[in-house]
Swiss-Prot record:
It comes from Mus musculus. It is found in: Cytoplasm; Membrane; Endosome. The modification Phosphothreonine is found at residue 328. Residues 378-388, 664-689 have a biased composition (Polar residues). Pfam families: bMERB_dom (PF12130), CH (PF00307), NT-C2 (PF10358). The CAAX motif is a signal for prenylation and required for endosomal colocalization with Rab8 and Rab10. The bivalent Mical/EHBP Rab binding (bMERB) domain, mediates binding to Rab8, Rab10, Rab10, Rab13 and Rab15 (in their GTP-bound form). This is EH domain-binding protein 1. The lineage of its organism: Eukaryota, Metazoa, Chordata, Craniata, Vertebrata. Its main location: cytoplasm.
Length: 1231
């Protein structure tokens, strides 16, 4: 298979297919004196593709007998087909080299390469048919060859063009270039590939066989054979863990005690629910324990229901061995008379047959005493042994009720720790009862390597979960299970049933099924890595390609896609955010739906875990989220549907909300090191760690509230009020100082802002990706409230939450709207105080301003108050409708401080711009680039050098918070006006004023991604809005200039001739940030490509050998991260290409308008025929341009509608699940 990364690199590129024909004319080869070639062959090759000429004899020359030639009397034509790729904004195609090789063919038929030479096919590609004569010099590969040349003519014919991912643009030969094996990896296949009925029969046979073995422990030899079968069954999915063998011994040794307790079997409260827990896909209506045990719905459940399974759930201690319970049922029904005989049988120590180092002591497993019985004090060991397997399961299952009795999973808990953690028989019983009755829709857990989730196994489990109810779909691996395309179609139909009709699919039509699935995924923005021909031509599809494609699908539907926030020179310092623009621009789930569980929560009793310490809970949580903090994104089961939802109908947004809480906890666990640097943060960090660990309910509202509030409290410890007073004093003291001192105060303000804003990056994941998790996860409604609720008593309320979580949650829910309204009132009051304070500071200054200046300031104050009132109205409206917009956090306490600073800063344009931008930067955004944002002043001093940098930084600001575009114009206008009032007429200041005017024009109607409060999508501002306003502004300026110059026709023509150059300059400035960001993205892409090539090579080697599973897992995690980053870059470049298209259309539209206005200004009777024809041509071109513009607007509108439809579908799904969750939660109760 061709490189997966190569295919990923081609996403979003244009492709053109060419046919090249080489007509060989003459070949010259000069060799040494001691050797001459037999027959020569010219081979044209690339990778595994070879095009050979016929063998020709070498004829020595007359002048130089060592230099011979091969002449083709009739040119021999060799034909190849080449696909060339290029970026949408690039001028030329990417390099693609084909190699000519001269080979010597011996009489025996063996070939040896003599010389080689390569040509770059892009140099000969042309849209028009061309023919080029080429004389190629070769590089000798053998000491026998001195030199060689080849003369041929190369013809090029353009065939077709399209997207790089189109099926007809894929090279069929490249599919086979890796020489894929015809035999699949047997490790990918599971033992049971039959239908459910056959599986049921096999399970019954296995159960009967194990029962027969247990009943007939007469001969050690027969026991050994059956024991080997049990070992195989237990070790196939569990990576040959020693614990499975150990539990198997317990099964045999503790059987006598289990037989003694048979009287309590029928009253066992865990029997049926526990089987249901182990088989979340089984029939819930089934009552028979045997049917539950022997009727799995998935192929791998033969392992999970096996008696030797070391990961099976916690059972009652009455059996001493919790793993023989189902077989005990079978034994009672099949052979009750054998029970008396079994009491006389002796347990056998098999540790020496299974493994060398037994964890049992010699006293417990004494081989010399065949009548030795296990001590009855073993429940402690049993509980801890069970806890290991159970914890590994529940780490990924995350049952809704907190499993108090579970010990921390990182180190295996010794028996001495059992009393500490409160684990006894009663707690095991109660917890098992509660957990077993809880719904368990999550996928079956994957094997665990060092407490880290296995990325490939979790991905496989997710695929099984999503496709479990679809006919004809049986997923056991990442190769053959996907070949017929039904599995891909099932996933697509599960999330987007409107895109595919699953019932109409034919399982035999491999190509059509795959084509429908790939086209459907591509239509929703998932990079296309597979083609239908891949599955048709290859009996065993490439495993890594399929895994990568499925990972992209899961990331898309679970909201784990990355998006670019900030690009740095070093890829490791670049910042990405989790979530995509289409769905995360505003709140993804409204209050009513998000808190739907609260009604069920009230019915539940408060979790009772008095014997459990916060440190124990924290250690367990820390081990759960090791991968999240190490990789920077969830690659585990946390991306699967949450525990409260039915897996087949769980909304992706609910999955997103669930997975979004994981980084919160990973941040809190990592905050112990970063928070220790600041003594002011340490106390709240500790409380955050403790509070974030209260309970194991992933989606319970009190957990979300506690974790979010604690994270925000770490920030609030910096005392926003005192910081605000400091800033007020700073601004007041500097109001009557000169400009240099004001810059010092601004640097102080920037440092204060940095102290506040840098708190979040300190607790971000150690991967240095800088995900702004708290600000980016706007899908959680409570996330937007974090920064708004900055009242001094927030810490107290947080501590109260620790004692009364349910009560606090109810209180927070009731007071949420009142708090929003109160915040709006505070903003209004602050605006009034700002205006009064500014007027007072102006009067108290060293010089009284002029009357016009005061009037201007009053107007500015009025405008500022109007903006704040508008913002307050939005806050109140949002509070009433229960929808929190993602821009609310930026107007919290700190934002109000910055508004005040901005209202007091006078006479310096940079101060206004700087505060505006800082105001809109989300918290945690200053990741290595915060200092850049405050250097616009110095950049303006060197406009020629730094104009590109300024534009690029302004663009970054707009991307960080698009609302900044709405405030920049007024800020820039105010700055320009105040600068002119101060009377600074120097050339530098004039230049600043001119550049700021251009910035005002650019951002008055910005081409940025606006936010819509009702639709979560990327909304590029429509072209008509952008174009129709801007030419109008220039038109007014043009009319004024024409009035000044008079109405003479000559002046009019001069004006129109002079204008285009200014327009071109303006256009250049406007598009500069696009060019700058494209360059930054390309640099980032090169670094990622370099690393990905190495990772893919190493990963393929590890997957083939299977020797180092830990390194393979680490490489897999890194590979998935790189794929996610690559897709983020692809999406960003697509958005920039749309901006570029709009800009090109706008430029042509403007220039046509200019020329057409000049023509229309001439009276008809004065026009010549040439002018009339020219006018008609201009009108026609303008109409065509408008049509193109409308087409672009329609495309953008279609994208917006598609996003709306997707959101509506997800909301409907969430609404359907609401009732199901309520019913399931009613069944949960703690005792």
């Amino acid at each position: 298979m061709a490189s997966v990364w190569k295919r990923l690199q081609r996403v979003g590129k244009h492709a053109s297919k060419f046919q090249f024909v080489a007509s060989y004319q003459e070949l010259m080869v000069e060799c040494t004196k001691k050797w001459q070639p037999d027959k020569l062959v010219v081979v044209w090759t690339r990778r595994s593709r070879r095009k050979s000429s016929k063998a020709h004899s070498w004829q020595p020359g007359i002048k130089n007998p060592y230099r011979g030639v091969v002449v083709w009397p009739v040119p021999e034509n060799i034909e190849i087909t080449v696909t060339l790729f290029k970026d949408p904004h690039a001028e030329e195609f990417e390099d693609k080299e084909w190699t000519f090789v001269i080979e010597n063919e011996s009489p025996s038929g063996r070939r040896k390469a003599l010389a080689t030479s390569s040509i770059n096919m892009k140099q000969y590609a042309s849209p028009m048919p061309t023919q080029t004569d080429v004389k190629l010099k070769f590089k000798p590969l053998s000491k026998k060859v001195v030199s060689a040349t080849l003369q041929f003519s190369l013809s090029c014919i353009f065939l077709r063009e399209g997207k790089a991912t189109d099926e007809d643009m894929q090279s069929l030969a490249s599919l086979m270039s890796m020489k894929q094996a015809d035999i699949g990896n047997l490790d990918d296949f599971e033992e049971d590939n039959e239908d459910d009925d056959e599986n049921r029969v096999n399970q019954e046979e296995k159960a009967a066989k194990i029962t027969e073995i247990v009943n007939q422990l007469n001969a050690l030899s027969s026991l050994d054979e059956d024991q080997d079968d049990c070992i195989k069954q237990a070790n196939v999915p569990s990576a040959k863990s020693a614990s499975s063998s150990e539990e198997l011994i317990n099964t045999l040794n503790f059987l006598d005690e289990a037989q003694k307790d048979l009287a309590t079997v029928n009253t066992n409260p865990f029997d049926e629910p526990d089987v249901t827990e182990l088989n979340p896909f089984g029939d819930p209506d089934s009552e028979e324990p045997i049917t539950e045990t022997t009727s799995p719905k998935k192929p791998e459940e033969s392992f999970y229901n096996n008696s030797c399974n070391p990961f099976k759930g916690v059972q009652t201690p009455q059996y001493l061995n919790p793993f023989d319970e189902p077989e005990t049922f079978v034994m009672i029904k099949d052979s009750p008379p054998q029970s008396t005989r079994r009491k006389n049988l002796r347990p056998v120590d098999m540790s020496k047959y299974l493994y060398a180092d037994s964890s049992k002591s010699e006293e417990e497993l004494d081989e010399s005493n065949p009548f030795y019985e296990p001590k009855p004090t073993s429940p402690n060991n049993l509980v801890n042994t069970v806890q290991e397997g159970e914890t590994e399961r529940r780490v990924k299952r995350r049952a809704p009720a907190p499993p108090a009795p579970l010990a921390p999973p990182a180190p295996p808990a010794p028996p001495a720790l059992t009393p500490k953690t409160g684990v006894n028989e009663n707690t095991v019983v109660s917890a098992g009862k509660d957990l077993s009755t809880s719904p368990k829709p999550s996928p079956i857990p994957s094997p665990v390597l060092g407490q880290k989730p296995n990325a490939s196994q979790s991905l496989l489990a997710w695929c099984r979960e999503v496709t479990k109810n679809y006919r004809g779909v049986k997923i056991t691996n990442f190769t053959t299970s996907w070949r017929n395309g039904l599995s891909f179609c099932a996933i697509l139909h599960h999330f987007r049933p409107d895109l595919i009709d699953y019932k109409s699919l034919n399982p035999q039509d491999i190509k059509e099924n795959n084509k429908k699935a790939y086209d459907g995924f591509a239509s929703i923005g998932i990079s296309r890595l597979l083609e239908p021909s891949d599955m048709v031509l290859l009996a065993i599809p490439d495993k890594l390609t399929v895994m990568t494609y499925l990972y992209q699908i899961r990331a898309h539907f679970s909201g784990q896609e990355l998006n670019v926030v900030q690009i740095e020179e070093n890829s490791s310092k670049s910042t990405y955010k989790v979530g995509n623009y289409e769905t995360d621009t505003n709140s993804s789930v409204d209050q009513e739906k998000f808190y739907a569980e609260l009604s069920d929560l009230k019915r539940e009793p408060e979790p009772h875990q008095p014997a459990r310490g916060a440190v124990d809970l924290l250690s367990q949580d820390d081990s759960v989220f090791v991968t999240d903090s190490g990789v920077g994104e969830s690659e585990s089961e946390h991306q699967t549907p949450d525990d409260h939802l039915s897996p087949s109908t769980a909304s992706p947004y609910y999955r997103r909300t669930k997975s979004d809480t994981e980084p919160q906890k990973s941040q809190q666990s990592s905050a112990r090191t970063s928070g220790s640097d600041d003594p002011g943060l340490s106390s709240s960090t500790d409380s955050a760690q403790a509070l974030a660990s209260l309970g194991k309910k992933r989606l319970k509202a009190e957990n979300l509230e506690l974790s979010d509030l604690c994270v925000s409290d770490k920030k609030k410890d910096v005392s926003p009020l005192s910081a605000y007073e400091q800033k007020l004093q700073t601004v007041h003291a500097s109001s009557d100082m000169e400009q240099g001192k004001m810059e010092k105060s601004r640097s102080l303000e920037c440092r204060l802002d940095g102290e506040l804003a840098i708190t979040k990056p300190n607790v971000s994941s150690p991967s240095k990706l800088g995900y702004n998790r708290d600000t980016d996860f706007t899908k959680k409604p409570c996330a937007s409230l974090r920064q708004i609720e900055s009242d001094p008593d927030a810490d107290k309320s947080t501590l109260n939450h620790a004692d009364h979580p349910n009560k606090a949650v109810q209180h927070r829910m009731l007071s949420r709207q009142e708090e929003l309204k109160e915040r709006a009132r505070v903003l209004l009051e602050q605006a009034r105080r700002d205006a009064a304070f500014k007027v007072g500071s102006k009067h108290g200054g060293s010089a009284a301003p002029a009357l016009c200046s005061r009037q201007l300031n009053d107007q500015q104050d009025e405008e500022r108050r109007r903006q704040l009132r508008e913002r307050a109205r939005q806050l109140i409206a949002e509070a009433r409708c229960g929808v929190k917009m993602s821009e609310l956090p930026s107007y919290g306490e700190m934002a109000a401080e910055k508004l005040k600073e901005r209202s007091k800063a006078s006479g310096d344009e940079n101060d206004n711009i700087e505060i505006d931008t800082n105001e809109e930067i989300p918290e945690g955004f200053v990741v290595g680039g915060g200092d850049e944002l405050t250097n616009i002043e110095s950049d303006l001093d060197n406009p020629e050098q730094n104009s590109k940098v300024v534009d690029l930084r302004l663009k970054k600001l707009l991307e960080a918070q698009p609302q900044v575009a709405n405030l920049l114009p007024s800020a820039a206008q105010k700055a320009v006006t105040e600068a002119s009032e101060q009377g600074e007429k120097s050339g530098v200041e004039d230049l600043r004023t001119e550049r700021l005017q251009k910035a005002t024009e650019r951002f008055r109607n910005p081409v940025v991604f606006n936010k819509d409060s009702t639709v979560r999508k990327t909304q590029l501002q429509s072209f008509s809005q952008y174009v129709e306003n801007r030419p109008e502004m220039k038109r007014q300026r043009s009319i004024q200039e024409d009035t000044k110059r008079g109405t003479e026709e000559k002046a009019e023509i001069t004006e129109t001739q002079r204008k285009p150059s200014e327009d071109e300059k303006g256009f250049k400035d406007t598009s500069q940030y696009v060019v700058g960001e494209l360059a930054a993205l390309e640099n980032e892409q090169k670094q990622i490509d370099t690393r990905a090539a190495l990772v893919e090579k190493r990963l393929r080697y590890l997957m083939d050998t299977g020797r180092n599973t830990e390194e393979e897992e680490a490489m897999m995690q890194e590979w998935f991260m790189l794929v996610n980053k690559k897709n983020a870059l692809i999406r960003r470049m697509n958005q920039l290409s749309l901006l570029e298209k709009e800009h090109d259309l706008e430029r042509r539209y403007e220039l046509l308008n200019r020329e057409l206005r000049a023509m229309l200004a001439i009276e008809d009777w004065q026009k010549t025929e040439a002018q009339k024809r020219r006018e008609q041509l201009l009108l026609d071109e303008l109409v065509a341009l408008v049509d193109k513009r409308d087409a672009l607007v329609r495309d953008l509108d279609a994208q917006e509608k598609q996003a709306e439809e997707e959101d509506e579908h997800l909301e409907r799904t969430l609404e359907q699940n609401k009732g199901k969750m309520a019913k399931k939660e009613e069944k949960c109760a703690l005792q």
